[in-house]
A protein has these predicted regions:
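Extreme N-terminal leader/targeting segments of oxidoreductases
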Residues: 1-7, 25-26
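Conserved mid-domain beta->alpha element of the FAD-binding
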Residues: 9-25, 194, 280-371, 390, ...
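Generic enzyme active-site microenvironment
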Residues: 32-33, 162, 301
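Glycine-rich FAD pyrophosphate-binding loop
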Residues: 24-47
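Conserved Rossmann-like nucleotide-cofactor binding loop
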Residues: 15, 38, 167
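Conserved FAD-binding catalytic core of PHBH/FMO-like flavoproteins
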Residues: 116, 121, 130-134, 139-284, ...
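Active-site-adjacent segment of FAD-dependent monooxygenases/related oxidoreductases
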Residues: 45-117
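C-terminal helical "tail/cap" subdomain of flavin- and related membrane-associated enzymes
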Residues: 4, 328-447
Length: 447
């Protein structure tokens, strides 16, 4: 069977632009269509997206694409969380072992860099302000509207990759097919992006070697460092309720809210009121669907296939891992897309569902449990067990610092939750958890 030499990518976001690099390196003629204007010319504005945390899966993908060195220059290591109590007390919680860290990267900056890298390949062509209006499911064609002129044109498309996000036009076409399963779920919480600018002397106003979290039970504030010495902050808060966005209408409301719940931030955020007014309040969606492919010639990747909430820092990493796995299958099946695509779609969907569930669970951990003494004790015991039993890997480390399939990490999370339910119920465990024979017995029994 003759394999296509040209491919269409719908969506020039993070996953689409990275996948264009992978395909270009293999010699394909790649056409990338994007609904939005070229962000390199239009300029990138924040306010809609959350700073990203690059971890092992993401780094592996950019390494395989040959672009790690270019992208690592502005990535800032965060070896742990810095917890901010209402009293102003700070507690540092390492993410993993010595030397392990996640990396703060700007979504816009990363997307700009990937576009630049992809555009250097002579066999990659970008078409901006082109909206996908129809995907022919019977014949290899796709139709785009030029949003500047209003003209539509049909493009031959023997191979289509839908990387056009949570509200994917390519997926929408597949949703019309028989037995296509699709669910979407919105959190009751929204988010708003805020800023801590550099200090007057040009330095950071807080420790840049941490992801800062202000956990407040049903809501939280987080802050990630940027290379320009600022922090990108994100407030996660219910849309409605006693403490919610609906009650933050005036400058006085916002100031009183921050003074009550995040008092140590007021001096750090001179543009708080301006940011709060000007930046949108955005929603948080989870998307699950199956199958991710159609007739071995149309494939969904990234958020188009598996949009998740951001609380495990894995949305981008999962999308980049899609590229890694697909590229490996290209080698395994000798470039035969009739085998690559169905194999990928069948193998990967369980991982998409699993990281969606893990991200939901981590939301509860970040906003609430991180301030709970029992949870902090669990973290200490888990780190100790990992040191004593190297095969015991905390689930966070499994997800963040390894390439363990997400569905395996989810099973391990269930197992470790059962294990720690027993350990934390042991009498006097708070004072006697190191070298405790009962803990060892439970570990041996559970494992």
């Amino acid at each position: 069977m003759q394999q296509p030499s040209s491919v269409i990518i719908v969506g020039a976001g993070l996953v689409g632009s990275l996948w264009a690099v992978f395909l270009a390196r293999r010699g394909y003629q790649v056409k990338v269509y994007e609904r939005r204007p070229d962000m390199r010319a239009a300029g990138y504005r924040g306010g809609r997206s959350i700073n990203l945390a690059m971890s092992e899966r993401g780094w592996k993908a950019v390494e395989m694409a040959g672009i790690r060195e270019q992208l690592s220059k502005t990535a800032l290591p965060m070896p742990g969380r810095m917890m901010h109590a209402v009293t102003g007390d700070l507690t540092f919680q390492p993410y993993g072992k010595e030397g392990e860290a996640i990396y703060s990267v700007s979504r816009g900056g990363l997307n700009l860099a990937l576009l630049e890298i992809a555009d250097r390949f002579p066999n990659v062509e970008f078409f901006f302000e082109h909206r996908c209006v129809d995907v022919d499911l019977d014949l290899p064609y796709i139709t785009f509207e030029n949003m500047q002129t209003g003209d539509t044109h049909q493009v031959e498309a023997p191979l289509i990759f839908g990387t056009d996000g949570a509200f994917s036009a390519v997926r929408y076409a597949l949703q019309k097919t028989d037995r296509f399963q699709y669910t979407q779920f919105y959190l009751d919480h929204g988010y708003k992006e805020l800023t801590i600018p550099p200090a007057a002397d040009g330095g950071y106003r807080m420790d840049p070697k941490a992801l800062h979290i202000w956990p407040r039970g049903n809501f939280m504030l987080i802050a990630l460092p940027n290379a320009d010495r600022s922090f990108t902050c994100t407030l996660f808060l219910p849309f409605e309720g006693e403490v919610s966005f609906e009650h933050l209408k005036s400058d006085a409301d916002v100031t009183a809210f921050f003074r009550r719940f995040f008092p140590d931030t007021l001096d750090l955020m001179p543009t708080l009121l301006e940011d709060f007014k000007n930046n949108p309040t955005s929603s948080l969606i989870t998307v699950k669907c199956r199958p991710w492919q159609w007739q071995n010639r149309i494939l969904l990747l990234g958020d188009a296939a598996h949009a998740i909430v951001p609380f495990y820092g894995q949305g981008m990493n999962a999308g980049f891992e899609d590229c890694t796995i697909l590229d490996g299958l290209h080698d395994q099946f000798g470039g035969d897309w009739s085998k690559i695509i169905p194999h990928f779609a069948a193998q990967r969907v369980a991982d998409g569902d699993a990281i969606a569930e893990l991200a939901q669970r981590n939301f509860i951990e970040m906003r609430d449990l991180v301030a709970d003494p029992k949870f902090l004790l669990r973290k200490k015991i888990a780190a100790h067990l990992h040191a004593q039993h190297p095969d015991f890997l905390p689930v966070y480390s499994m997800v963040t610092f390894s390439n363990t399939p997400y569905h395996i990490a989810l099973k391990e999370d269930d197992a470790q939750n059962r294990l720690f339910a027993q350990i934390l119920n042991l009498p006097g465990i708070e004072e006697n958890w190191m070298e405790n024979p009962e803990v060892e017995r439970i570990i041996r029994g559970e494992r």
